[in-house]
Structure formats: structure tokens, C-alpha cells
Amino acid sequence: MIKKIQTSLIALVVSVFGFFSVPLSTASAADCSVHIGDFDWDSANIHTAIGAYILENGYGCDVQVTKGSTNPILAALIDNQIDIIFEHWTDNNVQLIDPELESGNLVFLGVNTPASEQAFFVDRATSEKHNITSVEDLAKPEIAMLFKDPENPEKGRLTSCISGWTCYTINLVKLKEYGLDDLYTNFDPGSGGALDAAIKAASTKNQPIVTYYWTPTSLMGKPEIDLIRLTEPAYDESCWNDMMTVVEDIKANGPEVYKPSCACEYKDMALTKLATGKFAKEQPAIIDFANAYTIPTAVVNNMLAYYV
């Protein structure tokens, strides 16, 4: 993905520089070595590719990129094995990241994309035919069977996040709290590409699908993909924090430690950037650039539609 983007990125970078005003450094690669953490979804790949290109060609840095799922990349960042990440879904990892920010081990670098959403979606045709507009509407056996899981045909399938993403465990807890875990599996598609492929296949074959998804993405900008966001209990900070305590416990100790809590919708949020405190002290010019780096959501969607 990064190589594909960088082959035609020069003109894009010229236009992107209109969004920030930090002068390029003349530091040599010997003075600037950057290890960027990247993730296994498209918008993060875009930001990583742009950041890496600018750091290599504008700042003369020696850039290394390590790609992986949320949990191992954030663990590597906390352990100072990675220097910086250019996309972070803040509210999905509050319990993990906030203590690191408070201690100074990590530093917050501002917003990269001002608006995003993540939620449960149903294809429009199924939503309109069966009047499915909320998670409550999923709580009927006959509705669950519309989304039958071929690997567990007694249940419906919620096409969920990848198990290495925090949202996989969030969705697991949500299914339990909404009383849906006896009716639906929390299906791990295996990769972000496989998640996209499942949604595309359902659309092409006119098959029902209930799925977790998010924006910004290239898929949501395609005219043939028509998904309806399901309503959930409104976002509540106290409820969310209680739920995330359970989520982090499950991530650390396994699903058997689940304790009833509460659940609510994902918070629509700005996506952010993080670096280690050590790197911030050593490379203030790079931190100035990273703080200034931000691209409007509509531009990110257009880039994703073009490149992906």
C-alpha cells in the first residue's frame, strides 16, 4: 500500500502542504531516524505514506515503517520501539493510552482527520424490507437468521473487527450488553481487506449483511455500497468508560472475565497522532511538523477513493 501511494505522491504532497505551515528541515538522515507505526486499514496507510514521504524527502530522515494491528503497534509505541503514529482512534484506547500521556511516556500531536464515525450497519435493502433501524431490531431470531453465519448456522453473523483491533472486543461486549450474543457471532474476517471484501460481496450478490464499519474509508464513498447506520443507546462518557474497563480486562485476561456493564454507541471523533516522549525531546522539528499535519476528512475520503 505504501509503495503504491508513494509512486504518485509528489503532486499530492505539494497540495497537502497547503494544510500546514512548518518549513522543511535541512537535517541529514544521520541526524534524523524515524520509526513509524502503521496499521492494517486504509486511512492509516494513507497518513503513514504521506508522513513517511515528507520525512524522507523534506527532512532527510531515515524512515522505517512497521505495520500491524492496533494492539501490537500501540504496545510497541508504549515500549518506545516505535517513535510515532500518524493515525490513532483515541476513544477506542482511552484506558491504555491516557496513563501513558499523563506520565509523559507518550505525547499527543493533535488531530490528523477532524471527523470520523464507527458503528453497526445493515445494507439498505434489508433494512427497508424488514424495518431494521436499530440494534434492538436485531434482537429477534427471525432477523438474526437473515444474516446466518455459515460456520455457525444456528446464529446470525455480525461481521466485526479484526481480533487485533480494540473494536473487536468492544463489539463483543456490545453484543452481550445488547442481549445479542445468543443470536449472533462476533465474526473476525481476518483482515481489513477481508472485511471490505465481505461487504462488497454482499452488495454484489444482494445478500443481507450486518457489519461493523467506519469512515473515512474508500468503501463508503463507492456508490454501489449502501449501508444504513443502526441506532444504539446514545454515547455517554460514563457508560463508555465503564464498558472500556471491561474491554481492557478481556483483552488482558480473556473473554471469560467478562462482567456485565453497559454499552452505548461509538463516539464520532477526531482522529489523532501520537509520539513517544523520548522522540519528542530528540526531534522537536519533526514534532512541529507532526503537530501541524492535518487533512480534512473529505480530502482523506477522496484520496482513499483514488488510491484504494
Report the location of each language-model feature.
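A bilobed periplasmic-binding-protein/Venus flytrap-type ligand-binding module shared by bacterial periplasmic
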Residues: 118-128, 270-282, 305-306
